[in-house]
Amino acid sequence: MYNIGIYMDPISQVDFSKDSTVAIIKNLQRMAKIKLIIPDSIDYDSNNIFASSCDLEIVSLRQKKYVQKNNKRINLNKLDCIFFRKDP
């Protein structure tokens, strides 16, 4: 199973009916653990990049239901991929 980081605005502010990012996350979670990266928490230390993150699971797109758990600081170098999503 892959470990994928998602760097994005707070998910509570995302419009689930219009934003394709949540649909992408919903499909990715079948094959990967999704880590939601807190944008303002990224820092660099001893050749490693760290950030606060939490596990994210999209439960329902229609009902805008999601679960965030296991808040912790992680080494971003350990992720298989990081998806950057930013509103224009």
Model segments located where?
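ATP-binding N-terminal substructure of ATP-dependent carboxylate-amine bond-forming enzymes
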Residues: 1-88
